[in-house]
Structure formats: C-alpha cells, structure tokens
Amino acid sequence: TLYEEYENKNMGMKTINARDVWFKILDSQSETGVPYLLYKDACNKKSNQKNLGTIKSSNLCCEIVEYSDDNETAVCNLASIALSKFVKTPSIPFKHLDNIKIYTKNNCNWCLMMKNELKKNNISYKEEKVEVEDFESFKKQHDVETVPQLYDGDDLIGGYSKVAELLKPVFDYDELHKITKIVTNNLNKVIDINFYPTVKTKTSNMRNRPIGIGVQGLADTFALMNIPFHSEQAAIVNKQIFETMYHAALEKSMEIAKIEGPYNSFNGSPASQGILQFDMWNEKVSNDRYDWDKLKDEIKENGIRNSLLLAPMPTASTSQILGNNECFEPFTSNIYVRRTIAGEFIIINKHLLQELINIGLWNEETKQQMVKY
C-alpha cells in the first residue's frame, strides 16, 4: 500500500502510538461526531448487497453503503418523510365538553400550562380562581392539595399531569405505513425514468434498484408529543417508527415484485433467504405490530423489487424547507445559526417558542436568557 511505501522510505515526520491515535479518534467522535468512520467488515456483514461482492465505500454522508466495481457505479434514490406530520390530536376524553371547569390561582405556572393544553385541543372551559385566603378551605372541600384542578361536569379529573396525559398527542403509525408504501412506489418509478450521466450508473441502478427512505423531524415529533428526547418512551417510539417504515417499504417492494419481478441480483441475497436487516444485527423482532414471519415467507416466494430500502440521510437542506429539525438528530440548541447551500439562517426552537407564548412567558428577559445559555 502507499502507506507502507511511505513508511519504508522513512517519509514520516514522527512515529505515534496507534492506540493513542485511536483513543483520540474516539474522544473526538463522542464530543463532536467527527471524524466519520465506517467499519468495512460490519458494513459487508449487514448489507443485503453482500452477495454481489465486497462493498468498499459509502457516499459522503454514510447513509448508503452500496456495491460498485469497474462495470457499475452505485446510485441511490433518496426521499425523506416528515415525521412531525404524523403526530395527531387524541380523541377528547371528557364527557361534558359544555361543562369543563378549572380551578386556578394567581402566579401559577402549572395553571398556565393546563390552560395551554386545553387551548391546544380547542376545549372551552370555565375558570375559577382560588384566592389565597380561601385556599385551605378549597383543599378540604375538594380533597386536593394543589391547583390547577379540572372538573369534567361533576367529576374531578385531576391536576396538570393528569390532564396532560389524557390530552397527549398520539403518533399515527397506520398513516406512516401508508405513506412509506407510497414513497417506496414513487422512488421505484424514479429508477426507470431518471436521467443517468453515465452508462455505469444506469447499469447499477437497473440491476440492483436501491432506494433510500429517510426521516426528518424526529426531534419535532418528540417535542409535539411532550416526550423527552433521551427518555425510554422516546426510544420506544423511535423503534416503532422505523419498524413501521421498514415493514411498509419491504411489503410494497414485494408487492411490486409480484408484478414486475424481483431486482436482477436478488437471488443469493440475504432477503432471498428470508434474512432481513434485524436478523443480520441479531435483533429479535416480535410479531406484535406486524407479522414479520408472513412477510419473510412472501419475500422468499415473490422477491423484492429493490435491494436497499431505508437510508436515514442528514436532510440538512430539505428539513429547513419543511421547517423540521434535521433527520433523527436532537435539537442542537434552542437558538443557533444554520448554514446550508442556500445561505445562513437563525434557527429557533419553534415548539419552545410557541409554548412560552401560550403561557405568557415569552418576553425580552426570556429571549436574552436563551441567547446567553
């Protein structure tokens, strides 16, 4: 290799312990996310294209790892889905919508937050403020310790936490499944009608038919659902989102293959043997939400039209167009400068901003505190 050649010629400036370099790389990755490293053996072991030969590279952003050789140049056909669009308002759990009453008091942030929850769900209410001198008698009369308290007719529902839980937005997995199948179908059509700059790119795309479906706005989704990004609940929702997308993409690709046949290099691939991505990662997936065993049998019988399906890309520019946070990343900061090929923009966490406005806490002091920290 060139490295060994330079080493033999004593062209190096100095010698550094390899382990020290490795630890520096790991420190940098954990603190900054760079340098980008891919592990060749792991990439090939977990690829549905490993029957084609050894995969030697990825694209710049590392969301796709595809086979290339002297006769074909890998291409991928990408689209991202805005996850925030699948957050839906729950069905209203109250029985007496014409008789919702809340008890509040002055200088109570929890009271403001409860009113905000009701406002977001278009629920009208009557507010009664409890004066300081009446607070002890109020607690005894209603058998509560704090305000706010919400009544649905004559039924005590509870305080802010209870109401927030009842009105918590839900994620529409069925709609995501439907949209992912549409995107899969559309990207598959792009392969056939696309313009190819070289013969080798067309050869690769027609032979392997890879597509890459990614996401944007995962952080927005968690914000809309009032789920902390680092929480166990967020991990569950994240897993269910990608399980839904992977199942939908596989199912649609299989349905297309029933009509048009599997992609040319399907035979010998892991999918042709009923081995899917989670199998190559030694992950067990239950059939609670989707019947994976049935889908595997259908894929072995009919094939799939596309060798690759999901590819969570950075969405640095497209997420700005739709007003979402990038891909599956957490919010970088509540206020920051974003630079894209289109220019430089000041980005603010719009969900936090709206919450602060709704509860009356958006003011100059708050803004300066956000900028400071």
Outline where the language-model segments fall.
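Alpha-helical elements of the RecA-like P-loop NTPase motor core of helicases
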Residues: 112, 116, 136, 165
